[in-house]
Amino acid sequence: MIVTGATDLETAAPALSETARAKVNLTLRVVGRRADGFHDLESVVAFADCVDRLTLTQGAELSLVAAGPRAQECGQTADNLVLTAARLLGERIPDLKAGAFALDKYLPVAAGIGGGSADAAAALRLLARANGLSIDDPRLIETARLTGADVPVCVRSESCVMTGVGESLLPLDVPAMPAVLVNPRVPVATKDVFAALGLRKGQLNVGVNDLIEAIVWPEAGAPVDDWLAMLSDGANDLEAPAIRVQPVIGEVLARLRSTGARLSRMSGSGATCFAIFDDEAAAHHAAQTIRLDRPQWWVHVGTLGGGS
């Protein structure tokens, strides 16, 4: 049950706000496809400094309005993961206090950077604050998992190794790295990319010895070069099938790799790709070059990793 409909404005709680940071898969291994059809993954995840913003006005009827440059890409409001997460949490917590959500949408949709999952995670953090819950509350964790595979990692918005179908998170101290994110403004459906990968139910994709979970990652405070050396040994197993689904992803990667980046790769199931640079000046120069060549593309220059 979700409690709504407070009418006493003098006792109404103030609006609460959260940012929803873009999730970037620095590596992504598809371990295999389970008998239930889901894919087991292992991924090094970091978060970027580009965000959506979500506000909760407590006491109002549960609802969602979207604004901002990407609002029209969100689709039907009733299907939005923000409301899905709120309803699922309400099923698990009697008398959950919710309200009206307002989303300022800046991140591209169906882009491989977990925009919808980050929004849902921000909604759960807002509801936790409004109801005095810890983000470690088992009911909130269960809700995050049921809402979507990327939602648990987005609730914390901290660098980690994510395994399984998103349920296992191992924190990592990934340093802040100058980066450019590029999306060609072409949505890519995750199901289409996994279909192009073509694993059968029960089929493994990599051997146990290849799993990144067993890797000893650099310790806290290790230089960026140590991280880039290890990340460069990784890959995104969905990159090739995603390029078959949307060939423009190959062009995005080629342009990023032509800018002198230390590491370039696709995030998630695409189409967003990222590149990491030696310094901010190199990142800004690369972003400006790509914007001039492809003004219709979404380009963000900023930071990957580091603190929240």
From Swiss-Prot:
SUPFAM superfamilies: GHMP Kinase, C-terminal domain, Ribosomal protein S5 domain 2-like. Pathway: Isoprenoid biosynthesis; isopentenyl diphosphate biosynthesis via DXP pathway; isopentenyl diphosphate from 1-deoxy-D-xylulose 5-phosphate: step 3/6. Its EC number is 2.7.1.148. Pfam families: GHMP_kinases_C (PF08544), GHMP_kinases_N (PF00288). It comes from the Bacteria. The active site is at 23, 150. ATP binds at residues 108-118. GO terms for biological process: isopentenyl diphosphate biosynthetic process, methylerythritol 4-phosphate pathway; terpenoid biosynthetic process. InterPro entries: GHMP_kinase_C_dom, GHMP_kinase_C_sf, GHMP_kinase_N_dom, IspE, Ribosomal_Su5_D2-typ_SF, Ribsml_uS5_D2-typ_fold_subgr. It catalyses: 4-CDP-2-C-methyl-D-erythritol + ATP = 4-CDP-2-C-methyl-D-erythritol 2-phosphate + ADP + H(+). GO terms for molecular function: 4-(cytidine 5'-diphospho)-2-C-methyl-D-erythritol kinase activity; ATP binding. Keywords: ATP-binding, Isoprene biosynthesis, Kinase, Nucleotide-binding, Transferase. Catalyzes the phosphorylation of the position 2 hydroxy group of 4-diphosphocytidyl-2C-methyl-D-erythritol. NCBIfam families: ispE (TIGR00154), PRK14608.1 (NF011202). Belongs to the GHMP kinase family. IspE subfamily. This is 4-diphosphocytidyl-2-C-methyl-D-erythritol kinase. It comes from Nitrobacter winogradskyi (strain ATCC 25391 / DSM 10237 / CIP 104748 / NCIMB 11846 / Nb-255).
